[in-house]
Design a protein with these regions (language model features):
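Small/polar-rich, solvent-exposed N-terminal microdomains that initiate assembly or binding
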Residues: 1-54, 90, 94
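Generic detector of contiguous secondary-structure segments
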Residues: 20-27, 66, 81-85
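Short, solvent-exposed beta-strand/turn "edge" segments of beta-rich domains on protein surfaces
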Residues: 52-57, 116-118
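Oligomerization/assembly interface segments of phage tail-like spikes and tubes
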Residues: 57-71, 83, 121-132
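Mid-chain, well-packed structural core segment of small domains
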Residues: 69-92
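Acidic-leaning, charged glycine-interspersed low-complexity segments
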Residues: 88-130
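Compositionally biased, intrinsically disordered low-complexity segments enriched in polar/Pro/Gly
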Residues: 135-136
Length: 136
């Protein structure tokens, strides 16, 4: 299984934001220059091979990344684009002990979702991680 905590560590290792500024779940007091990693519940059927779930060799983890940066739109856009570019140019990937077959970016560029109530610019990147299932 590909866990959110492992994806959070992968995003942290990309060095766009400091490690303690990359989080999963909701934080009441988001720090500037942070990235949130959330499950993205977009519609998709489960991966099911003929013969049942145990015959499926891969699965999909849908993720939404929230880039919560600062009050400068240019700097915020630049940080979001830097993250997007690193994801787009990934050539080989293991997250934790899980081999990633490929990832699909679901948006053509980071999506500007405006500012939060404190005027901090935010961008969203939605993507799917296709990973090899490690069957016991």
């Amino acid at each position: 299984m590909l866990a959110l905590k492992d994806i959070r560590q992968y995003i942290s290792d990309l060095k766009i934001a400091e490690d303690d500024h990359v989080y999963i779940g909701k934080l009441d007091a988001k720090q500037d220059k942070s990235i949130g990693v959330y499950p993205w519940p977009g519609r998709r059927q489960p991966v099911m091979a003929l013969g049942g779930r145990n015959c499926s060799s891969y699965d999909v983890k849908r993720i939404s990344l929230l880039v919560h940066w600062n009050r400068n739109i240019s700097e915020s856009e630049s940080a979001a684009c830097a993250l997007y570019g690193k994801l787009l140019n990934e050539t080989s990937l293991m997250i934790g002990n899980t081999p990633i077959q490929f990832l699909i970016l679901q948006v053509p560029e980071p999506v500007n979702v405006g500012t939060d109530d404190k005027g901090i610019y935010e961008y969203v990147i939605e993507l799917d991680f296709y990973y090899r299932r490690l069957v016991n």
